[in-house]
Amino acid sequence: MAERTHACGKVTVEAVGQTVQLKGWVQKRRDLGGLIFIDLRDRTGIVQVVFNPETSKEALEVAETIRSEYVLHVEGTVVERGEGAINDNMATGRIEVQASKVNVLNAAKTTPIIIADDTDASEDVRLKYRYLDLRRPAMFNTFKMRHDVTKTIRNFLDTEEFLEVETPILTKSTPEGARDYLVPSRVHDGEFYALPQSPQLFKQLLMVGGFERYYQVARCFRDEDLRADRQPEFTQIDIEASFLTQDEILEMMERMMTKVMKDAKGVEVSAPFPRMKYADAMARFGSDKPDTRFEMELKDLSEFAVGCGFKVFTSAVENGGQVKAINAKGAASKYSRKDIDALTEFAKVYGAKGLAWLKVEEDGLKGPIAKFFGEEEANVLMSTLEADAGDLLLFVADKKSVVADSLGALRLRLGKELELIDESKFNFLWVTDWPLLEYDEDADRYFAAHHPFTMPFREDVELLETAPEKARAQAYDLVLNGYELGGGSLRIYERDVQEKMFKALGFSQEEAQEQFGFLLEAFEYGTPPHGGIALGLDRLVMLLAGRTNLRDTIAFPKTASASCLLTEAPSPVAEAQLEELSLKLSLKEEK
């Protein structure tokens, strides 16, 4: 078999007159009575092949048996297309190949999905036949971008003298974070490894080991409830460095991301990226990952509410809550009462008891709550919300977390419905100065806002023992277009500070020693100050490739129920395997 001389999508007018050897899949076959045209596809694109009896009767006879997705080896001569046959929508649209020989390398059954970007197959069918779905050009282009992003990051970190180091996949289960995936040990009866949720502890230990600059394209595993932008196994760009300040880490990541955007996406973004404190992000956008491509910020009306005539507003503030509103500019005529009822139900999903609203008309405020406000109060509302005739004002009165969650989500929904978002923009943002701890009322304890190894501000270390809720973290998240790309922090590197952190999280001294004794001991041998960041590769590629589903950026992803439709994993295992692991199943009864 002759070697391939050209990729299908790379045959251009420069090759006219040449004999070429092509190999690929049949995208489409057209029989025009005496002539057969085949679109031959490989990962670079499509070229038109013509089977003409005047060129080769034998090749034409074979072509008559060919169907879509057959794998072919074609030999032929490149010729220019006639004027009326030129297709400027194809890179190869000015030429075609006159086939002299064709060899069917493999036949194909009729495929269960259409191999085209506009396939009508459901996602379940696409996942079951993922190897066919991956043939679609849009899928290949997504994974080409993933490769380009990873390559650019590796090259950048190499120039910055980072070492790529692999850390263990079989490790120890720790109590913080999401549920672990557990792996039973055959050698140690009744004991389990855990698959890593991140390489956090190992990368810190590499800093203890004097490596100074580490990175890894790391596989991570979390047994958590899934959604469109979550998978049980995912990939993160894991980075750690010694002796760098927070500003130095952020500046380096900005240089890396501007290079990724330019090299992998062809888009110039400017640095430094804007920075916003966590408290400001929550106050202005109701989100710790604000989408700054459009405005519509939350406005605090709590002071106004104290003296207003609407008791719902007044009582919310008196009970320690707040009143906030958003102004959907020019949207009054676009939302009927029924539409606003739908927005109300949407807000309730996020804990709001209801959604108050007003429409601004030329002669004043209209709506169910307009009667509660006199002329002076109406003017204050209009001024605070920068309202004009035609605007729709939406209010939530509740505890602070509910106000932020509901109005933040409502803001995003309205941004999409009103087409306020410029989809061509890439808005990066650093969210800094996070709270170190978050209190969970159900569990009646504090949890780490990021993880238990995050360094507090130096002046806040003592607050861990006196007022943990006031302690701030030297932590930072990188946000792109309303998605958290990744998070990082400076790390605790002194044993006494780490022990205070564990105590604030409710660990007894014995529990801390049992779970993290190896780390605490490491901190006694001259641990350098260090910090880092982990960026979600799957999510970054999703945003750059313009996909809406994380599964489209992972070659063989899981469904929302964490199953693989292709291999049918997870699956039962043989009784003998369980016995070898000293395991016995106790299945939950179906309700």
From Swiss-Prot:
Main function: Aspartyl-tRNA synthetase with relaxed tRNA specificity since it is able to aspartylate not only its cognate tRNA(Asp) but also tRNA(Asn). Reaction proceeds in two steps: L-aspartate is first activated by ATP to form Asp-AMP and then transferred to the acceptor end of tRNA(Asp/Asn).
Cysteine-cysteine disulfides: none
Domain of life: Bacteria
Annotated catalysed reactions: tRNA(Asx) + L-aspartate + ATP = L-aspartyl-tRNA(Asx) + AMP + diphosphate
Coarse class of the protein's main subcellular location: cytoplasm
GO cellular component terms listed in the entry, alphabetical order: cytoplasm
Top-rank EC class of the record's enzyme: ligase
GO biological process, one term: aspartyl-tRNA aminoacylation
Self-association and partners: Homodimer.
Positions contributing to ATP binding: R222, D223, E224, Q231, E484, G536, L537, D538, R539
Record carries keyword Chaperone: no
Pfam families attached to this UniProt entry: GAD (PF02938), tRNA-synt_2 (PF00152), tRNA_anti-codon (PF01336)
Cell compartment(s), UniProt: Cytoplasm
Molecular function GO terms recorded: aspartate-tRNA ligase activity; aspartate-tRNA(Asn) ligase activity; ATP binding; catalytic activity, acting on a protein; nucleic acid binding; transferase activity
Start and end residues of each stretch annotated as Aspartate: 200-203
Keywords for the protein's UniProt record, in alphabetical order: Aminoacyl-tRNA synthetase, ATP-binding, Cytoplasm, Ligase, Nucleotide-binding, Protein biosynthesis
Taxonomic lineage from the root: Bacteria, Bacillati, Bacillota, Bacilli, Bacillales
Organism of provenance: Bacillus mycoides (strain KBAB4) (Bacillus weihenstephanensis)
Family statement: Belongs to the class-II aminoacyl-tRNA synthetase family. Type 1 subfamily.
Protein name: Aspartate--tRNA(Asp/Asn) ligase
HAMAP family on file: Asp_tRNA_synth_type1
Enzyme Commission number: 6.1.1.23
